[in-house]
């Protein structure tokens, strides 16, 4: 059994035209054992930046506090709002610096660029390797299930959009 399954949880983010959606479950537990049903896994980092943290809950809270601390320092030094891409790079660097005794959490960043209003979503593994697809991303113990459902729905949406063009 993976270390990630001890407190479980899954976070999903989808990007649209000028919008992002981020969703999660509220349960914390291992397999059939439920510890809590009101656990917050999505945290607001900036005006338009959200971070979802799955995995070991105490590590997720530690990572969240470090993200908020580094975001405040960034905005003080740079005198501007943090962009989602910058937040993702910052989190990735933070996780990679602790790779040998790392945090047991998988972050997901979703947000809108404050200047261009373009959506940005990305997911990371426990050592900070960034995966930033255009349409959807998931992290956590239910990641495989969410990705399958999203791929099926996305294929259906693309098929419905393109099918009328082919019939004409």
What are these regions (language model features)?
Residues 1-103, 128-168:
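Conserved short S/T/G-enriched processing/targeting/catalytic segments and their helical context
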Residues 110-128:
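Acidic-glycine-rich active-site phosphate/pyrophosphate-binding loop
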């Amino acid at each position: 059994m993976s270390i990630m399954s001890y407190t479980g949880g899954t976070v999903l983010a989808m990007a649209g035209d000028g919008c992002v959606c981020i969703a999660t479950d509220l349960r914390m537990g291992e397999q059939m054992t439920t510890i809590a049903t009101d656990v917050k896994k999505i945290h607001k980092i900036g005006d338009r930046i959200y971070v979802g943290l799955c995995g070991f809950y105490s590590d997720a809270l530690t990572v969240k506090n470090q993200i908020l601390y580094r975001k405040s320092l960034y905005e003080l030094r740079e005198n501007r709002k943090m962009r989602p891409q910058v937040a993702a790079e910052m989190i990735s660097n933070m996780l990679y610096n602790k790779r040998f005794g790392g945090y047991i959490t998988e972050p997901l960043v979703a947000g809108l660029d404050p200047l261009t209003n373009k959506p940005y979503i990305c997911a990371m593994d426990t050592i900070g390797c960034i995966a930033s697809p255009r349409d959807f991303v998931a992290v956590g113990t239910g990641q495989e299930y969410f990705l399958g459902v999203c791929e099926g729905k996305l294929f259906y949406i693309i098929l419905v959009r393109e099918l009328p063009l082919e019939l004409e």
